[in-house]
Amino acid sequence: MSVFYTNIQLAGDTILYRGIKHGEPVQFRCNFSPTLYVLSNKEEEFKTLSGKNVTPMTFETAKKAREFIQQYDGVEGFEVHGYERFVYQWIRREFPGEIDYNINQMKIFALDIEVQSENGFPNVDEAAEEMLSITIKDMVTKKYYSWATREFTPPEGVEAFIFWTENEMLNHFLGWWAQNTPDILTGWNINLYDVPYIARRVNRVLGEKWMKSLSPWGRANEREVYVQGRKNYAYDISGINILDYFDLYRKFTYTNQESYRLDHIAFVELGQRKIDHSEYENFKDFYTRDWQKFMEYNIQDVELIDRLEDKMKLLELAITMSYDAKTNFEDVYSQVRMWDTMIYNYLTDRKVVVPPKKIREKDAKYAGAYVKEPKPGLYDWVVSFDLNSLYPHLIMQYNISPETLIDERHPRATVDRILEETLDIDGDCCVCANGAQYRKDIHGFLPEMMQSIYNERTIYKKRMLNACLLYTSPSPRDRTRSRMPSSA
């Protein structure tokens, strides 16, 4: 039976752990002692990127480790190596190998709320309008749960809880939530609407203590998020991964849509529209005159999220990426954090420590990629080339990596001289168009990583194409060929 984490936080000096053990949810607190490395004159197990020996220093608490880093920051000749995002040190220590996870053992909820609109669209900032209903779909068991402030006939498969006041509804919802806390919460724009509205409304109606009970650790923190210059509110609910399907769709699909409303995206991807209520004058008229249809409208939103996931597997993609990198699920939105952690794990496997973190102010502009200026005119036989995984291949081609970079730039390198093949290049180095030079006598860790990831991508791309051929080709011969093992 497998053991895997679902969420790990570092609160002060304490690890807050949630995960699955042998199919059952587990949750605990524990202390953590981070490890850093300093230069050593003796032969040691771990080395720096440049090959220097380093010795480990284990600290009693994360606070003491941070104080040590600050104490020697800027001290000439004293280097403190090691990954400073300590929570990922703990993950690696507890899960050193490949993580054997099972999505079907997690609690993954799709959430949608409906709110009164007595004075236009409800304002999250004030959370002054009463909540009318809450619907959750467990995307693993496929069960529905609806809380409502009026009676309705629940569709088949929906467990309904009916109350006469918002206060009663919220009390029951929070009690149920505490007994069924999800590992992942999703929905459409829940990060900037549903979750902050619930949190602010509960805080307003029941008090801060009840609001913080949304978190299994009693930790729910508000933060400001600016979107196109407009201030929004989001909540970090400790222990729960909020993976907004709206954000996942924007990040992992590569076509621009004319609208990102759920109604439009569901039509584009599923051929289905949300329940139409245009016969009513406004939203208030809708829930006042046809409560049954209104609740079906609420329930349909979480059903659409589940159908989108069945087709697109964006949650599954985020989960897979997170376990590959050994990060939390929400980290998929941060490319820097994902890559930093992947590099940390890759180097640690090879007994190499992460170099000291350098903070630089961006006070200068950097030249972008070279773009050849087109010459206007009429041309025959025009072709277009799309290079496969261009940036990774450039990194591999030029052996681009921190430890292979040479301090001196090539004195005569320019784009034009390289294109005209008039530049003399010493065979000991790779020379880039901007004059940067990279050693060739050692293989950099970054191109090694790129090659490994690209090889895996090639294997799974072929498997995907074979699967597509199997299900779309009418030819028995093609179907037979698709079952043949890939040579990759």
Predicted regions and their residues:
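Short helix/loop capping segments that flank catalytic or ligand/cofactor-binding pockets
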Residues: 118-121, 145-146, 196, 251-253, ...
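Conserved RNase H-like, two-metal-ion catalytic cores of nucleic-acid enzymes
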Residues: 3-10, 14-44, 95-184
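Active-site-proximal helix-loop-helix substrate-binding element of RNase H-like nuclease domains
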Residues: 144-147, 154-160, 164, 181, ...
